[in-house]
């Protein structure tokens, strides 16, 4: 049995700490309606949860780069006012973060969500005090891939030994991003 004790824990946000289904899918529906694409069932848009938005709009709707950029702007128009709060905290999240902090582990956020939105969500759920650092994507797309976000968190903190670090997330992007940065990962199955 592995008795390894990690000192630095990176968490994904959407699908790992929170259930953002209504907010994200409603924001995607709003963006798609701009292109006269109507969606009846929000659950059909769940694949948008996790990956970078540009990738999703291009993969799922064959948008060009330009169309995807417009869709992202429309998505953020809705999300920044309403979708950000159409979100629920998974049961036990607050207690888990409290216990990790009490056991002197440092907690970081590494999310594909734009950093200001991620910070707002942590504040909305009163979780911000648990986090040593919050890392997210940028609005200009210069840091949108999960591997880049993880690298940003590692570069922006005092983490010296990568073997002391683990990334916890619910999507392949979290696991692949951790691997690209030579850190361990743990996948959750409930997100």
PLM regions and their residue ranges:
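Conserved Lys-Pro-Asp/Glu-containing loop-to-beta segment of HAD-superfamily phosphomonoesterases
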Residues: 8, 146-175
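Helix-loop "lid/cap" segments that line or gate small-molecule binding pockets
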Residues: 31-32, 52-65, 121, 149-156
